[in-house]
Amino acid sequence: MSLEVFEKLEAKVQQAIDTITLLQMEIEELKEKNNSLTQEVQSAQHQREELERENNFLKEQQSGWQERLQALLGRMEEV
């Protein structure tokens, strides 16, 4: 092989190595972003569950107050 062909081959190999290195760095960045987004999703799910529990509790309280109010209104009508 001539020196010129060898240099071209070496340049192509170096370019391939550089491309692979950049892609590996991009993969690592995407993995980190994916992990971050996964944590955000888990946090949002946890918050949603808490809000659903609180909503159910408040609905139960509202129902209790409505029953009491109906009972009081019933007593007032009796008087």
UniProtKB/Swiss-Prot annotation:
A Gene Ontology cellular-component term: cytoplasm
Domain of life: Bacteria
Broad class of the protein's primary localization: cytoplasm
Coiled coil: 3-79
Keywords linked to the UniProt accession: Cell cycle, Cell division, Coiled coil, Cytoplasm, Septation
GO biological process, one term: division septum assembly
Compartment list: Cytoplasm
InterPro entries cross-referenced by the UniProt entry: Cell_div_ZapB (IPR009252)
Family: Belongs to the ZapB family.
NCBIfam families recorded: PRK15422.1
Subunit structure and binding partners: Homodimer. The ends of the coiled-coil dimer bind to each other, forming polymers. Interacts with FtsZ.
Physiological role: Non-essential, abundant cell division factor that is required for proper Z-ring formation. It is recruited early to the divisome by direct interaction with FtsZ, stimulating Z-ring assembly and thereby promoting cell division earlier in the cell cycle. Its recruitment to the Z-ring requires functional FtsA or ZipA.
Identification of the protein by name: Cell division protein ZapB
UniProt source species: Salmonella typhi
Organism lineage: Bacteria, Pseudomonadati, Pseudomonadota, Gammaproteobacteria, Enterobacterales
